[in-house]
Amino acid sequence: MTTFTHINSQGEANMVDVSAKAETVREARAEAIVTMSKETLAMIVEGKHHKGDVFATARIAGIQAAKRTWELIPLCHPLLLSKVEVNLEPLLETNRVRIQSLCKLTGKTGVEMEALTAVSVAALTIYDMCKAVQKDIVIEQVRLLEKSGGKSGHFVAEEK
């Protein structure tokens, strides 16, 4: 049976010791979906939001969040990320925005939490910038899409 890596033999939370692990190229992709009204999405896409470019702001927020994941998630290691990418795609037919991230490094631990944090904070930034015009925006389906590198192997999520 697989065990929780962040719990020691006394049942206490602790940071995993990665000092003996080999450095490998590690990559993770994540996504989040933000659902809003047709009018709110149109305002964003047409550049008519009074706060400015919502997607550019969300992209930068997601990148910044990935770089600071270790400050937000208590047992995450500080990582020297070599790449962080955040893409936002308006899905006009469903009044949604698909946010996807890619995080990459050569190191001793994975970058899943950084990828998940990137999409989460990008989604929260969209909500923050749009809450004045719509309060019932929904953030959903925050999930890991893919990870590679390390001894746990390659993971690819099932399509939804």
Curated annotation (Swiss-Prot):
CDD domains, sorted: MoaC_PE
EC code: 4.6.1.17
High-level lineage: Bacteria, Pseudomonadati, Pseudomonadota, Gammaproteobacteria, Pasteurellales
Keywords: Lyase, Molybdenum cofactor biosynthesis
Pfam families assigned: MoaC (PF01967)
Biological function: Catalyzes the conversion of (8S)-3',8-cyclo-7,8-dihydroguanosine 5'-triphosphate to cyclic pyranopterin monophosphate (cPMP).
One BP annotation, GO: Mo-molybdopterin cofactor biosynthetic process
Pathway(s) where this gene product acts: Cofactor biosynthesis; molybdopterin biosynthesis
Single GO term (MF): cyclic pyranopterin monophosphate synthase activity
Covalent S-S links between cysteines: none
Active-site residues per Swiss-Prot or TrEMBL entry: 128
Residues involved in substrate binding: 75-77, 113-114
Keyword Lyase on entry: yes
Catalytic activity: (8S)-3',8-cyclo-7,8-dihydroguanosine 5'-triphosphate = cyclic pyranopterin phosphate + diphosphate
Family under the similarity heading: Belongs to the MoaC family.
Name of the protein this chain belongs to: Cyclic pyranopterin monophosphate synthase
Signal peptide (from-to): none
Subunit structure: Homohexamer; trimer of dimers.
